[in-house]
């Protein structure tokens, strides 16, 4: 799955 919950963005 793709989403803010699984992906860390800086």
From Swiss-Prot:
Gene Ontology MF annotations: aspartic-type endopeptidase activity
Highest classification ranks of the organism: Eukaryota, Metazoa, Chordata, Craniata, Vertebrata
Originating organism: Dama dama
Source organism superkingdom: Eukaryota
GO biological process: proteolysis
Name of the protein: Pregnancy-associated glycoprotein 39C
GO cellular component, one term: extracellular region
Alphabetical UniProt keywords: Aspartyl protease, Hydrolase, Protease, Secreted
Main localization, broad class: secreted
Summary of the tissues where the protein is detected: Expressed in placenta, specifically the fetal cotyledonary tissue (FCT) (at protein level).
Family: Belongs to the peptidase A1 family.
Compartments, record wording: Secreted, Extracellular space
């Amino acid at each position: 799955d793709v989403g803010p919950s699984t992906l860390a963005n800086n």
